[in-house]
């Protein structure tokens, strides 16, 4: 029975980390087993339910601080759950109401509450565009593919439910309830996957710098239902010691070797080393040959940023390498943020569009 399988699984796999689940998915999808990400996506609910009692929790400082991306993510899920409850109540009450004026108001309320629920798309987009690129950098490339595919299925289910809701009273309330519950079931399951598996992977893998970058870029995508109550500014500890005021007493060069004499309370000692070649630092204001004339990097940057168009550059290896900065992030036609630079362009799009993206790239 499913219960006995769950019991055996819990007894065997208790204490598994979310990162280990990620590695399992990666191994399945990248081995010769013939398992594709579509197969893993189809069984996503199955293995999420199996692992629900086994995943080991992770605690990281500051994640419950207002404004921290993890706190924002969880707060959004709470607000979205509350909106789901309100829709369910309205749908449940609708069947028992006979007054036509009240039914009209209830239909308006349903559409309004569905509009709030629909803001989950902002939550998903921020997850896909800010969390997933950093996950891929750390080698966790399989969970994003699977989760993005399921996200798109949930988006489709929501659209079906929204169309049905807006079609009242032409369609029966039973049809609306059925469509809404089909969406809500998958949506609530995704909340569990986000908070019990996805966030655990992120907390084990991401550095404070990663979270700071996500917090800084989140405004470009917006927030679902609620906004952070304050900006998260973590305390930063300097790890580089200040240079000592005392400098070495002597520096001599002998046959290309540098000898450095250092004074200590016990006396002097000499170290000999071959200095590294100094890397040439590009002067952003120096003139470089550019097309039919000369431009500095700063001048070229200003020109590109003042063109009346959004520019994205993908190199010959299909790596997203550059975008110009002429439009506020929240007004971009195609939202791009610094965390996406360096990402394979195929990973910048939902899995269901992968073949279309490949065809476009090959055509270019």
Regions found by a protein language model. Name each.
Residues 1-121, 125-363:
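Small-residue-biased structural context
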């Amino acid at each position: 029975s499913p219960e006995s399988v769950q019991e055996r699984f819990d007894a065997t796999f208790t204490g598994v980390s979310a990162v280990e689940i990620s590695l399992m998915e990666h191994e399945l999808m990248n081995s010769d087993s013939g398992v594709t990400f579509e197969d893993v996506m189809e069984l996503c609910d199955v293995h999420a339910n199996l692992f629900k009692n086994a995943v080991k929790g992770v605690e990281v400082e500051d994640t419950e601080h207002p404004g921290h991306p993890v706190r924002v993510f969880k707060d959004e899920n709470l607000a979205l759950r509350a909106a789901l409850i309100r829709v369910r109540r309205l749908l449940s009450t609708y069947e028992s109401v006979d007054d036509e004026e009240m039914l009209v108001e209830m239909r308006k309320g349903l559409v309004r509450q569905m509009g709030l629920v629909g803001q989950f798309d902002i939550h998903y987009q921020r997850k896909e565009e800010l969390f997933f690129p950093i996950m891929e950098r750390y080698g966790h490339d399989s969970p994003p593919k699977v989760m993005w595919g399921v996200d798109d299925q949930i988006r489709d289910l929501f659209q079906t439910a929204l169309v049905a809701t807006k079609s009242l009273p032409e369609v029966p309330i039973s049809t609306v309830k059925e469509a809404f519950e089909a969406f809500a079931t998958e949506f609530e399951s995704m909340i569990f996957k986000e908070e019990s598996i996805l966030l655990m992977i992120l907390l084990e893998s991401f550095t404070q710098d990663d979270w700071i970058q996500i917090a800084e870029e989140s405004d470009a995508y917006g927030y679902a239902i609620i906004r952070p109550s304050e900006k998260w500014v973590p305390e930063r500890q300097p790890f580089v010691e200040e240079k000592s005021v005392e400098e070495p007493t002597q520096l001599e060069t002998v046959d290309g070797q540098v000898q450095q004499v250092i004074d200590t309370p016990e006396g002097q000692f000499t170290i000999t080393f071959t200095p590294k070649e100094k890397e040439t630092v590009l002067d952003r204001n120096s003139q470089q040959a550019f097309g039919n004339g000369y431009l500095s990097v700063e001048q070229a940057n200003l020109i590109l940023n003042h063109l009346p168009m959004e520019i994205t550059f993908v190199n010959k290896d299909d790596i997203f390498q550059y975008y110009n900065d002429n439009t506020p992030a929240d007004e971009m036609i195609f939202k791009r943020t610094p965390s996406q630079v360096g990402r394979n362009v195929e990973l910048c799009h939902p899995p269901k569009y992968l073949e279309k993206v490949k065809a476009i790239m090959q055509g270019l």
